[in-house]
Amino acid sequence: MTTPAAPRRPFFRRRKTCPFSGPNAPKIDYKDTRLLSRYISERGKIVPSRITAVSAKKQRELAQAIKRARFLGLLPYVIR
C-alpha cells in the first residue's frame, strides 16, 4: 500500500522585466541600429514581446523605431 504524495504546486515561470523600463534603461532611438538589431530575428522580422519581455507600450515604440530605421535604410527589411 502506498501513501498519497503531497500535492504538487504548478510550475510558475517568473515574468522577466522590461529591458526599457527602469532608471538607467536605454532609450529607443531609430538611429541606434545596434540596439534595434537585437530585437530583429535572423530573417529580419521583429521579435514578439512574449519572447523579449518588452512591455506593450515599449514594444510599440520599438516597432515604430525599427520601421523608421528600415525606411531610412539603416536596417534591412529582409535578411537572406
Swiss-Prot record:
- Provide this UniProt record's keywords sorted from A to Z: Ribonucleoprotein, Ribosomal protein, RNA-binding, rRNA-binding
The record's disulfide annotation reads: none
Gene Ontology MF term list = small ribosomal subunit rRNA binding; structural constituent of ribosome
Record InterPro entries? Ribosomal_bS18, Ribosomal_bS18_CS, Ribosomal_bS18_sf
Gene Ontology biological process: translation
- Xref: PROSITE patterns: RIBOSOMAL_S18 (PS00057)
Please name the Pfam families in this protein's record: Ribosomal_S18
GO CC annotations, alphabetized: cytosolic small ribosomal subunit
Instruction: Decide whether keyword rRNA-binding is in the record.
Output: yes
**NCBIfam families, sorted:** S18
Summarize subunit and interaction data from the UniProt record for this chain: Part of the 30S ribosomal subunit. Forms a tight heterodimer with protein bS6.
Q: Which family does it belong to?
A: Belongs to the bacterial ribosomal protein bS18 family.
Sum up the protein's function in the record's words.
Binds as a heterodimer with protein bS6 to the central domain of the 16S rRNA, where it helps stabilize the platform of the 30S subunit.
Q: Which PANTHER family match?
A: 30S RIBOSOMAL PROTEIN S18, SMALL RIBOSOMAL SUBUNIT PROTEIN BS18M
**Name of the protein this chain belongs to:** Small ribosomal subunit protein bS18
The scientific name of the source species is: Beijerinckia indica subsp. indica (strain ATCC 9039 / DSM 1715 / NCIMB 8712)
